[in-house]
Regions:
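Juxtamembrane intracellular "pre-TM" segments in multi-pass secondary transporters
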Residues: 2-20, 199-233, 421
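C-terminal transmembrane bundle of multi-pass solute transporters/carriers
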Residues: 3, 67-71, 75, 79, ...
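Pair of pore-lining "gating" transmembrane helices in MFS-fold secondary transporters
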Residues: 10-42, 46, 119, 223-244, ...
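Hydrophobic core of transmembrane alpha-helices in multi-pass small-molecule transporters
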Residues: 27, 109-127, 236, 319-336
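Small-residue hotspots at the loop-to-helix junctions and early N-terminal turns
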Residues: 36, 49-56, 150, 261-268, ...
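Short amphipathic helix-loop junctions that connect adjacent transmembrane helices
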Residues: 39-53, 247-262
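Short hydrophobic/aromatic, small-residue-rich stretches within specific transmembrane helices
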Residues: 56-63, 268-272
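Hydrophobic alpha-helical transmembrane segments
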Residues: 111-122, 144-202, 269, 321-324, ...
């Protein structure tokens, strides 16, 4: 373990200025994102008194853009400079976020306003995420894709660990809408860090093909790649279930268990400790299991352990411990899974197709999330939060088991290059 951690911090990527700027910016943005996500839930639940169904709609709007423009965004990004796309998306996020505290100060904040901002942030996220995932192979080289993704995933986990706790503390001091100011400041730093990247970016490939033709080419590539398409289907199913779980957990904690927003933030923060450990130890799992079995094993364990969380309603005295421990274990395994499957996709995809491939997978993940969010809100209203959580966790476990039947699950080594047809 000590050797793994030491090697992680002394990797050649730490001498790559472009990657370090991207990494620093992403770390700040992830902290802000987590604070903003918690603040959004607190505003909807505590300030605007939204119902379970309205909360589901609000969560759905945050990812609706992936369903609407997810596929064309990939084709567009393939023809644009990725760094410029990320900067413009960051500036747009800042403007949208600042509107919330301004509306609150002038007593004009409504649920409709919050929903519009959620939708705009989702649109910015579409373009930023597609560009950022396509930018990593440009600045990190294919040799270090897995290491780069591991560090960026660690940034996500640092944000997930520190963001909710910081957000919960801030919610105890300020009104939820004012906490959005911190999120805006983190995006200011993130945008500045990306702007500081000086590494020349290759000119994007431009073709005379129409947008529809480019989208079809991307879809045909994913559909015809024997490793990608089965993985695509399983990831889409898992994302639907995960979106439902993410909507239901805050309701379980804040309403069913009657905890405070501060307690919710701390519980989410503790859970992310497992994610940081997962990013640090992923290479050991890869050496022992290979790519395929690492994806399957970590995915199944990571979602199955979440079944402990709804049982917390039957043990109020131990509820916080149950949610925290299951969150740590789940985050550990799902971080290893996420980094491994993302690195596999980037490794086997040709450079001119990265934007479209990433957009198609983002479409699969984020595009179905509005449906999962909405379905979970309706399910909770009909059968109760606890029962709804069991249903969505079972769906996630089923999707993970299905991954074991895909060709990707049979990759035994630590690289997929020799398996590309």
């Amino acid at each position: 373990m000590a050797v793994t951690v030491r090697a992680w911090f002394h990797h050649p990527l730490t001498r790559n200025s472009a990657f370090m700027h991207l990494w620093a910016g992403q770390t700040a943005a992830q902290v802000g994102f987590q604070v903003g996500t918690l603040a959004t839930s607190a505003i909807a639940i505590s300030v605007l008194r939204a119902s379970e169904t309205q909360i589901g709609v609000l969560s759905a709007l945050q990812t609706l853009a992936f369903l609407i423009v997810g596929l064309p965004a990939g084709a567009w990004v393939d023809g644009w400079r990725k760094r410029r796309v990320m900067i413009i998306a960051g500036l747009a996020r800042i403007g949208a976020l600042i509107s919330i505290p301004l509306a609150y100060v002038f007593a004009t904040l409504t649920l409709t306003h919050l929903m519009i901002v959620a939708a705009l942030l989702g649109l910015c996220t579409v373009f930023f995420d597609v560009a950022y995932q396509s930018y990593v192979p440009i600045i990190a080289s294919r040799r270090y894709i897995g290491a780069a993704n591991g560090r960026l995933e660690a940034s996500y986990q640092v944000g997930h660990a520190g963001g909710p706790g910081l957000g919960g503390w801030l919610l105890g001091l300020f009104a939820p809408p004012l906490v959005y100011l911190l999120t805006a400041l983190t995006y200011v730093f993130s945008t500045w860090a990306i702007w500081r990247i000086a590494t020349p970016e290759p000119a994007p490939t431009r073709t005379g093909a129409t947008l529809v033709a480019q989208i079809r080419e991307g879809l045909a590539f994913v559909r015809g790649q024997r490793l990608l398409f089965p993985l695509f289907s399983c990831i889409a199913a898992a994302a639907f279930a995960a979106a439902g779980i993410q909507v239901l957990l805050p309701i379980l904690v804040l309403r069913t268990l009657d905890m405070s927003a501060t307690q919710l933030g701390l519980l989410l923060s503790v859970g992310a400790i497992g994610g940081i450990l997962g990013a640090l130890t992923r290479s050991a799992w890869m050496k022992h299991l290979g790519i395929g079995r690492t994806i399957v094993v970590t995915s199944i364990i990571g979602v199955a352990v979440l079944a402990a969380q709804p049982t917390a309603v039957h043990a109020p005295a131990a509820a916080a411990a149950i949610i925290a421990v299951s969150g740590i274990v789940s985050s550990y395994f799902l971080t290893i899974y996420n980094v491994t499957q993302m690195s596999l996709r980037q490794e086997i995809c040709p450079p001119h197709m990265l934007g479209r491939m990433n957009a198609i997978f983002r479409f699969a993940v984020w595009g179905v999330m509005p449906l999962g969010s909405l379905a979970s809100g309706v399910a909770a209203s009909w059968m109760g939060v606890e029962a709804a959580m069991y249903v969505f966790i079972a769906l996630a476990v089923g999707a993970s088991i299905a991954m074991g039947l895909t060709p990707a699950a049979r990759i035994r080594g630590t690289s997929a290059i020799n398996t590309i047809p």
